[in-house]
């Protein structure tokens, strides 16, 4: 039979292990950015829509459905889509909100070794935490080259 101190030691050790595995809001946001990148590369408009907030606003006032249609048009134009982060994410966290800036190379092609199109963009995004999930509320991108 375990004594009180032994039980306390086991409980504290389990609590410490649980605390170590808890994901921080910033890490969850970084994971969401990575899942959006994967959705674009997988040409999955449904997964893209899932990340966008209902009140999403993009360049020129494009809304959530407009952004999804823009992605679908790109998918029709290019059989393969590549998104490569060209440097680290610059994350600024605030309670319930965040902004993420990064450089991204976007490529599109027909499946051959070399892409048919490639462009580098400066991207600035705004995020909101909704029911434990990060949702993209705004995005602006400008060509770099």
Short names for language-model regions:
Residues 55-57, 106-107, 143-144:
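Solvent-exposed loop/turn segments at secondary-structure junctions
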């Amino acid at each position: 039979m375990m004594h009180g101190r032994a039980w306390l030691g086991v409980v504290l050790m389990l609590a410490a292990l649980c605390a170590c595995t808890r994901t921080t809001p910033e890490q969850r946001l970084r994971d969401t950015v990575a899942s959006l990148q994967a959705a674009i590369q997988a040409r999955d408009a449904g997964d893209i829509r899932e990340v966008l907030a209902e009140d999403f606003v993009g360049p020129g006032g494009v809304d959530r459905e407009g952004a999804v249609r823009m992605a679908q048009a790109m998918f029709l134009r290019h059989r393969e889509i590549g998104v490569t982060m060209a440097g680290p994410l610059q994350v600024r966290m605030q309670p319930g909100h965040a902004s993420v800036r990064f450089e991204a190379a976007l490529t599109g092609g027909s499946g051959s070794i070399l892409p048919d199109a490639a462009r580098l963009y400066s991207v600035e995004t705004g995020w909101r935490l909704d029911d434990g999930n990060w949702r993209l509320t705004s995005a602006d991108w400008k060509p770099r080259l």
